[in-house]
A protein has these predicted regions:
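Alpha-helical transmembrane segments of multi-pass integral membrane proteins
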Residues: 116-175
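Cytoplasmic juxtamembrane regions at transmembrane-helix boundaries
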Residues: 2-7, 81-104, 169-175
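Hydrophobic alpha-helical transmembrane segments of integral membrane proteins
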Residues: 94-124
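Membrane-helix interface motif
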Residues: 30-46, 121-127
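Perimembrane loop-to-helix junctions flanking transmembrane segments
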Residues: 40-58
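Transmembrane alpha-helical segments in integral membrane proteins
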Residues: 66-87, 152-166
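Alpha-helical transmembrane segments and their helix-start/interface "positive-inside/aromatic belt" motifs
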Residues: 5-26, 103-106
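Lipid-exposed faces of alpha-helical membrane segments in multi-pass integral membrane proteins
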Residues: 16-30, 65, 69-72, 111-119, ...
Length: 175
């Protein structure tokens, strides 16, 4: 693949990543408030604890913030992809900046099950805060574990990219 085609493809992916980043925040917000405040029957929502819908405005707003935690993780992942593909768009392929992007991506992916755990606990607290008793619930599913495993694989790729950047630098110095 030529540098020009890598640059063109990266430009197209950047548009997709930006759209996805904005769209994920907006959709999560709309779905959260639709499901919790209006009890939209067309939307099947699940919560870490049993709740009776619709929620009060305050309870819905308090629950919104922990519900956004996994969306913010997605935004952080998309941001790292944007940074990486901007480098590709500029023709920067085997440089330490790329390896740093891969490293940050790996850390975010490895953090996925822990973030989901935290979100479940905080969301269950937020949704049960006025019942007189505090309920705690969390879940970690196989997709979270899969993301963590992918994170370890991406971390190995980051190390390989660091070595490639070193080789690229040596190659440029010897010419």
């Amino acid at each position: 693949m030529s540098q020009q085609s890598i640059s063109n493809f990266s430009s197209k992916l950047l548009i997709l990543f930006w759209f996805s980043m904005v769209f994920s925040v907006v959709l999560n917000t709309v779905f959260w408030f639709s499901a919790t405040m209006f009890n939209a029957e067309w939307f099947n929502a699940s919560y870490p604890i049993d709740v009776s819908l619709p929620l009060s405005n305050a309870r819905s707003l308090i629950g919104y913030f922990p519900s956004m935690i996994s969306t913010l993780l997605t935004v952080a992942l998309l941001w790292q992809l944007i940074v990486l593909f901007r480098l590709y768009e500029k023709g920067i392929i085997f440089q330490l900046q790329n390896a740093e992007c891969f490293k940050k991506l790996s850390y975010l992916l490895i953090a996925t099950p822990f973030v989901e755990f935290l979100m479940g606990v905080l969301l269950s607290f937020a949704l049960s805060y006025n019942d007189g008793n505090w309920n705690t619930s969390f879940s970690i599913d196989d997709s979270d574990i899969t993301m963590m495993i992918i994170g370890f694989i991406v971390r190995v790729i980051a190390v390989v990219m660091e070595k490639a950047a070193d080789l690229q630098e040596e190659s440029e110095l010897t010419v």
